[in-house]
Amino acid sequence: SNGVPELGMVHVPVSGMNYLGQVGTGAWKVNPEGELQEISVPRFSKGQSAVRVVASRNHRGELVDKLIIAMLSNGHILLEGVPGLAKTLAISTLAKTFDAKFNRLQFTPDLLPADIIGTQIYSPKNEKFSIKKGPIFANFILADEINRAPAKVQSALLEAMQERQVTIGGESFILDKPFLVMATQNPVEQEGTYPLPEAQVDRFMLKVIIDYPKKEEEKIIMRNNLAKTFPAANAILKPKDILRARDLVKEIYMDEKIEQYIIDIVFATRYPEEYGLNKLKNMISFGASPRASINLAAACKAYAFIKRRGYVIPEDVRALCHDVLRHRIGVTYEAEAENINSEEIISDILNTVEIP
């Protein structure tokens, strides 16, 4: 039908963004200015607002946006922040809003891979092994303090994240869709921890750093919590709505100039001198991998989607650059001695690379 593929109930434009697509009960259309007039299912943005309202009881609206970006781009999030900043609240609220299954894994030094993925149990009665699935079989996983468990446990989780399947007793099981892992690290306590190797950290689409709330925000948090006057999360959407929205996100338009901008930013982390950033040459021990370009492009499309736009703009790239790149750039001892971290390196690159 005139080059428009059908994805279930979603009609998606291949080229030209002025096509009206029906999605279940709602419509997604892009007007001549390229704005998304209604987003996928109109309930989707309602779901997003609902999550934001509940999470805002602890002022975590920006974290919710990042979770939704990862969810729409089929990625995972690494969170760094001290305890008590409503990380669990944000992801459990998101799961409730999408009527999805949520599990929390508390990582400890004595945890075993079988505790996460599941194991075989022998039944003497029927003299057979049966499979007992682990808590990894859920849509949303909170891996709390991932750096507290030994490497073999971390790699079991990271393999599941990458392959989206696990093997128990030689049998493979596909994980639920959607599948989002939010892993947390406490930046303060480093004693008795097992730091994630660079190759493992690279598998997280975003690394988000959460800071303390501002004075006014904390006053509202305190009042709301004491008065117990916070909104409850209701199931507004279903997991299948996420999968539908993902199909639409893929169709968000990204101009070649934006693609080039993303490539230039990532290449500047590898070859800073080619972009006139000679001072960074001795500050970077290794630059971002091709995963950075792929993830930055995917995240920008999802960001445009939640901002109700049918196309990506340079501001989207700049807004997400730190989250996508901060854990993919290695800094040298020289940089550490001068108190220069990856944040400053990314800011220097953004200030230098030409904006399309």
Identify the residue ranges that each predicted region occupies.
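An extended, acidic
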Residues: 35-66, 251-260, 269-273, 281-298, ...
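P-loop (Walker A) phosphate-binding loop of NTP-binding proteins
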Residues: 82, 116, 184
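Conserved alpha-helical scaffold flanking the Walker A/P-loop in AAA+ ATPase domains
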Residues: 69, 122-142
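Walker A/P-loop
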Residues: 71-108
